[in-house]
Amino acid sequence: MKFVTASYNVGYPAYGAKFLNNDTLLVAGGGGEGNNGIPNKLTVLRVDPTKDTEKEQFHILSEFALEDNDDSPTAIDASKGIILVGCNENSTKITQGKGNKHLRKFKYDKVNDQLEFLTSVDFDASTNADDYTKLVYISREGTVAAIASSKVPAIMRIIDPSDLTEKFEIETRGEVKDLHFSTDGKVVAYITGSSLEVISTVTGSCIARKTDFDKNWSLSKINFIADDTVLIAASLKKGKGIVLTKISIKSGNTSVLRSKQVTNRFKGITSMDVDMKGELAVLASNDNSIALVKLKDLSMSKIFKQAHSFAITEVTISPDSTYVASVSAANTIHIIKLPLNYANYTSMKQKISKFFTNFILIVLLSYILQFSYKHNLHSMLFNYAKDNFLTKRDTISSPYVVDEDLHQTTLFGNHGTKTSVPSVDSIKVHGVHETSSVNGTEVLCTESNIINTGGAEFEITNATFREIDDA
């Protein structure tokens, strides 16, 4: 299985990346306020690491320069040609209370491969230049968006990306580590370091919450892998290790579907993305490596060590799961071309391992069966089950005796009739004297009848039959 990789120096520290389509990548970053010649930019590139030259591997389609005196972009997302960028204006303007249009909207024209600025807005009205837009996300269909501030506790806003109007404001319980939309955009989930909260984007109300995570986990990233299932990545507070956990939020209840420590090589992760099918996750580690995880069994499938020379700020997967892109504060873009249908691919090593595992299980089962037959264990087991389970089952008391009724036969002359008596512990009849005639036979009923139905025994005493002359 072959991976093709390529790297490119974009010329500025990159803090955000997002695929606009299967091979078109948007990158944002810059030197920030007082950038010393390092621009603040948005760059659109067509990527293909299989090409021969760097220019073909990373073909710049469009660039948009931001104000030199403004801060560098801190967060971006895009959907259906709409791009939202979190980027503060210059600090002097902010501290003077002149506003800070920290959320900016762009449009990408895929026909002309051009970026166009549309509008910007100030939601926070902050005079603290250290406050910035930490997270920006748009739903897959582009119908709803969410932003979160760097404040603690953070303010999260659900907005309409079409006109940048606010729908809801959510006061969180602490620092928002990450957030993400369900595939249909009806639900947004966010995490703090120790909790998960799920919010309806229709009503703004909380529909699910989980706070009982492992105390040794520090939650860091979240992504929906289905409309009712989220994937959360956490680092271990004590020692190295990354844990992935799948959590169902169906019907407003949270339940852990599976958790697994996928590696003990990393101390933390800086970014995570999941493909559109919910089959593959890509993680960026604190040691500047890229890791691929197959979500069907939460197995670590590939690690690209030291993909960048400095901190990885974001990873993203193309819509068709062909490319994985990562960007870094080291001014670099790194592209990995994945093998076809990689998430479901089984390597030769895995096939051999599975074969030998199955072979050993078959041999072991055959040995057990042979041993059982040789020592007649199957008959012993059957007899044991018969004596201890089947017999007991047949004698379990019920409203009626076996065959549902206890049958008593009473003879009248040469004929017989059968009557049914419900089962009780005992039926006792005393002093009954009744004479009746049946076909010329007089019957005197018993002086004392005792029917012990517990043991299905009958005692009939003093039964007298007298012949009656036909007159």
UniProtKB/Swiss-Prot annotation:
Its membrane topology: Single-pass type II membrane protein
Keyword Repeat in annotation: yes
Repeat region (WD), residues: 259-300, 302-341
Membrane-side (Cytoplasmic) residue stretches: 1-354
GO molecular function terms listed in the Swiss-Prot or TrEMBL record: GTPase activator activity; guanyl-nucleotide exchange factor activity
Pfam families in alphabetical order: WD40
Locations listed in the record: Endoplasmic reticulum membrane; Golgi apparatus, cis-Golgi network membrane
Keyword line: Endoplasmic reticulum, ER-Golgi transport, Glycoprotein, Golgi apparatus, GTPase activation, Membrane, Protein transport, Repeat, Signal-anchor, Transmembrane, Transmembrane helix, Transport, WD repeat
Main location: endoplasmic reticulum
Glycosites: 439, 462
Coiled-coil regions, chain positions: none
Residues in the Lumenal compartment per record: 374-471
GO biological process: endoplasmic reticulum to Golgi vesicle-mediated transport; protein transport; regulation of COPII vesicle coating
Annotated GO CC locations: endoplasmic reticulum; endoplasmic reticulum membrane; Golgi apparatus
Transmembrane region(s): 355-373
Its biological purpose: Guanine nucleotide-exchange factor (GEF) required for the formation or budding of transport vesicles from the ER. This function involves the cytoplasmic domain of the protein, which is thought to interact with the small GTP-binding protein SAR1. Required for autophagy.
Family to which this protein belongs: Belongs to the WD repeat SEC12 family.
Miscellaneous comment in the UniProt entry for this protein: In the process of transport, SEC12 itself may migrate to the Golgi apparatus and function in subsequent transport events.
Protein's name in the database: Guanine nucleotide-exchange factor SEC12
Protein's gene: SEC12
